[in-house]
Amino acid sequence: MISKNEFQAVIGHGRVTDDPKVLESYAADNSYTAPKKPALVVSPTTRDEVIAVVKLAHAKDVKLVPVSSGAPHFRGDTIPAVKDAVIVDLTRMNRIEWINRRNRVACVEPGVTFDQLQRELERQGMRAMIPLCPRGNKSIIGAYMEREPFTVPKYAWDLGDPIASSELIIGDGTMVRTGGGQGPGKTFEDQRKVGGAHKLPLSS
C-alpha cells in the first residue's frame, strides 16, 4: 500500500487526503456496484502533476480511479474495483484553455463542467453539444467518453464526434495526443500559432 507522504512528495500537501469521511464519499454511488473504500484521494491541478501521480502509482503497482464530475455518480465507474486503489479527483483541473469560434472548438481540462463551458460559450453565441439531461457539474470530457446520448444527432456523426483531439496520460505516465492534436508542433500552443485548431480536416 502506498503512503500519503509519497503522493504529497510529488503534488504537495493539501491535495492528498486519507480522511475517513472523504474516502467514504468515494466508496459508493447510486448504482448496484458493490461499495469499496479507496486508500487515498489525490487532487492534481496540472498535467505535470497528473504525470507525476501516474508514474508513482505505476512504480508502486497502485491502481488509480479517475473522477472528473461532481456528485452524485450513477454508473459505478468511480468506485474502486480493488483494495487500496487511489482516487484521482480531476475536478480542480477546470480551466477552459481556449475557445475558437471560427472552427467551433473549445480546449478544456477534464474537470470543466457543462455549466461552466456553456456560460462561456453563450457569450460568443454558441452552445456545447449537450447529451440527454446532463447535470450542471458533469464533466464534459467524462460525458463524451462515456458515450452519453445526444439530443441533437443532426450535428454529430456519432457519439464520439465532439472530441476532435485529446491529450492523454497513459498507464506508465507517458503523454500521448490523438486526432488533430497530434501535430504539427510539439504542443497545442505551437499548433495555434500557425492557425491550427486541433481538428481533423474532415471534422465539421
Give a label for each model feature.
Residues 95-97, 110, 115, 119-204:
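FAD-binding subdomain of flavoenzyme oxidoreductases
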Residues 14-16, 39-41, 61-65, 84-87, ...:
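Structural motif
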Residues 7, 57, 173:
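Residue-level signal for inorganic ion chemistry
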Residues 41-49, 54, 105-112, 132-133, ...:
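Catalytic cores of large soluble enzymes that bind and process phosphate-bearing ligands
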Residues 3, 53, 117-120:
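Hydrophobic side chains in well-ordered alpha-helices
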